[in-house]
């Protein structure tokens, strides 16, 4: 029996959003004001605060050392407490609005982002196979140049926290037979030295992080700049979920780069439509993902060149 394609919305997701402008206690209280009744300060190495929402799911505010702290109020002493990371719980697509309201609340409380802040999106990997994970990596390799351009990824982050796909490792992974096991894929990812039990393994710092599959059970996308715009956050999450589903639904992928070309907006819009982001439901998602790219998203070439756009010859004088 032919397997039905996976709807990308039928996947769990979560995210980490880095911010500053407010301290961790304020961020935690903001969540408590939204969900009630209070924030629990559990401390520890990440100085964690925990808040449960109305569904009993736990949201966390933690420290992230990579953030450059800022505050718009000059009278406030800025320090380590202004390095803030929001960790969402495991969410269903139907809970997207809940996440968006958290993002809006943090912005209203004074939260801001800067070039040191990133957003990481996790998509549940439980429906994936070695072949589908191979497909996801190949899709990322193929599209990463235009993805980096569309998302305006900070070059400093590309060099450090969200590097491009490791081409030699991907080549080895693609050589695995169609019936390869997850252990074989893991062996190729770690190059024969299993690091799946080490949280900060160096292989995690990829735009598409497969270390997270073996450590957390999720595929992690690390290439997004942080945002406290609810629509942008939603667009980032949907893009990651759609690529994940495409990896599951495709039988195979090609090992080649997609050229950006002279009309990047059209090239990327075509990719988004192939991911299933079609119609009015995803109009704003497409808008956010395309807004940084030059070109005409509706026409591959100069639209005046198409016969349908040529002026019609006059067939006779008006009477």
Regions found by a protein language model. Give the residues of each.
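C-terminal accessory/tail domains of diverse enzymes
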Residues: 1-112, 126-319
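Active-site histidine-anchored catalytic micro-motif
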Residues: 114-116
